[in-house]
Regions:
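Conserved Radical SAM active-site core
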Residues: 1-99
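Structured alpha-helical segments in the cores of large, soluble enzyme domains
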Residues: 27-34, 86-91, 118-131, 230
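Short, well-ordered coil/turn segments that N-cap beta-strands
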Residues: 36-40, 71-75, 93-96, 131-135, ...
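Conserved radical SAM core fold
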Residues: 47-52, 82-85, 96-115, 141-146, ...
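Distinct, well-ordered alpha-helical segments
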Residues: 55-58, 85-92, 148-156, 185-188
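Short, electropositive alpha-helical surface patch
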Residues: 57, 98-101, 148-164, 191-200
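Conserved C-terminal portion of the radical SAM core fold
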Residues: 121-182, 237
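Auxiliary Fe-S-binding modules of radical SAM enzymes
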Residues: 160-247
Length: 247
């Protein structure tokens, strides 16, 4: 219900597929050359999830292979889906990072409808880890509700129990708290009029983001509590993993 696509593409979100890969790789090369000797990372899931259509496009496989032997180019994407078997035998050379969006059972069941459940995503992540990819988990949006603290603690413990221990050093976390724009709220309520997703602005504070527009975010006290709940738990159960950020 909270998905970016519902507000970016209106009431009928769609997946945009680009078929001009050769041209895109040429553009990417121009950016890489400009930034050398720095390494340039390209994000493959900024506006849509590429995994559900990979069976038709093979875009991810071709992109992973393209960057596998590039000295200065890297690739990454994030998904909520689990059909990753076609990516397991590709020569990735550790140059592609694959991340999975995870959340508590309640969030996935109530507000993440139409996607594979938590355990299916974790099973897919295990396959990716065993295939040698750098991998990660994007926990988000982190939503506060009754007993949310315990649910997120249990989520971290479940992750720790499922990931192959030898791969934890290649694991990263991105922690993203729930936020919404006025446009997002309007669109969500139109598409999901019966939603119980908490969109009450009186419980939020207004904050301008990096792209120049504002969002309703959790107040500092709530943000601090989220940090206190998740960060120590990750450090305790997955000490070799890296926490990239909490926003």
């Amino acid at each position: 219900h909270y998905c970016y696509l519902n507000t970016n593409f209106g009431p009928s979100p769609y997946v945009r597929v680009y078929v001009n890969l050769t041209e895109i790789f040429e553009w990417a090369e121009e950016y890489i050359i400009q930034r050398q000797p720095l390494t340039t990372m390209f994000e493959g899931s900024a506006t849509s999830d590429p995994v559900p259509v990979e069976g038709w496009t093979q875009t991810l496989a071709k992109t992973i292979e393209h960057f596998a032997n590039h000295p200065y180019g890297r690739f990454r994407f994030v998904t909520k889906f689990d059909n990753v078997d076609s990516l397991l035998k590709i020569n990735h050379n550790n140059h592609t990072q694959i991340r999975f969006t995870l959340n508590t059972e309640r969030v996935v069941k109530n507000w993440d409808t139409g996607t594979p459940g938590l355990h299916r995503r974790l099973a897919a992540a295990e396959k990716i880890a065993l295939a040698g990819y750098p991998y990660g988990f994007l926990i988000g949006p982190i939503i506060t509700y009754d007993n949310w603290q315990n649910d997120y603690r249990e989520l971290i413990q479940l992750i720790a129990a499922k990931v192959p221990p030898a791969t934890v050093k290649h694991l990263s976390f991105e922690l993203i708290t729930h936020r919404f724009t006025p446009r997002a709220k309007k669109q969500i309520l139109q598409v999901y009029p019966e939603t119980d997703l908490d969109l009450d602005e009186t419980k939020r504070v207004w904050k301008y983001g990096q792209f120049g527009y504002g969002k309703w975010v959790y107040p500092p006290a709530t943000y601090a509590t989220i940090q206190e709940v998740l960060v120590p738990k990750i450090h305790r159960y997955l000490p070799q993993a890296t926490i990239m950020y909490l926003v």
